[in-house]
From Swiss-Prot:
SUPFAM superfamilies, per database record: P-loop containing nucleoside triphosphate hydrolases
Keyword flag ATP-binding: yes
Record keywords: ATP-binding, GTP-binding, Nucleotide-binding
Membrane-spanning residues: none
Protein name in UniProt: Nucleotide-binding protein RHOS4_02640
Disulfide-bond pairs as recorded: none
Annotated positions binding GTP: D62, V63, R64, N65
Organism: Cereibacter sphaeroides (strain ATCC 17023 / DSM 158 / JCM 6121 / CCUG 31486 / LMG 2827 / NBRC 12203 / NCIMB 8253 / ATH 2.4.1.) (Rhodobacter sphaeroides)
The keyword Acetylation appears for this protein: no
NCBIfam families the record matches: PRK05416.1
InterPro entries membership: P-loop_NTPase, RapZ-like, RapZ-like_N, RapZ_C
Domain of life: Bacteria
Amino acid sequence: MVEPVQEYRLVLVTGPSGAGRTTAINALEDMGYEVIDNLPLSFVPRLIEGPSIGRPIALGLDVRNRDFNATALIELIDRLTQDPRVALEVLYVDCSASELIRRYNQTRRRHPLAPAETPAEGVEREIDLLAPVRVRADHLIDTSEMSPHDLKAELSRWFDRGAATRLAVSVQSFSYKRGVPRGVDMIFDCRFLKNPYWVESLRALDGREASVADYISSDPRFAPFFEKLRDLVLFLLPAQLEEGKAHLSLGFGCTGGQHRSVAVAELLGNALAEAGWPVSKRHRELERRAAAVLPTHQGEKA
């Protein structure tokens, strides 16, 4: 039996208001997607019934849609998933409640679910409403600490098929004291390694410095750990690619997010790049420290 050919590559873009959904939609349009924003859910099946337009489609869906509700959206996802003509991906553009509230207060906009109440009430209401949809997402991007430029770059790695033919990898370091980043596929705890913080000459430096990396590498446990880590990730990447994933996110944590996690993320990122994989590196706590000294107008969020 010949299986039907998939005629539509369809990306449903949703997420809480203020998280960056509009930025995501615009970025996908720049990549060549046919973009339709705020299309009523009941119209989506009719769109698929029509002739193929020859390029991927991105649909923006949020609580402002005329007939939006989470149950109807999940039913639509199930229906499209079962349609052999459709290659469906669900992109959920997420953000922490505290950051969403900050953005609303900064712009003085009213929340669509709480026009006569505080933004905090609308944000919490919308997060609860979208919770069942969030767990169905194929791709989750947390924009809490992203600028619009960061979001566009992340989307390019995931959805711009012309930009790369291999699975893209992002590695990031973080501090456990500030919480585990959301949207990370695999997390590795680096707190068992020797801590350069206790060496006065290294304390003010970070894991990108050769002297810090050398100190961490001198830990007898480092070499076998890193060899196993590199081999594991290099083993998993082709398997993830075969499963249709376009992106894999790896997180490395330590106490302060300055030395050990940064060094390991840097070293693994370099090793994967040498093996031919597209890699992006991010150091959350170092970015926070750098952002603290920038003028306020440079801190625009997605």
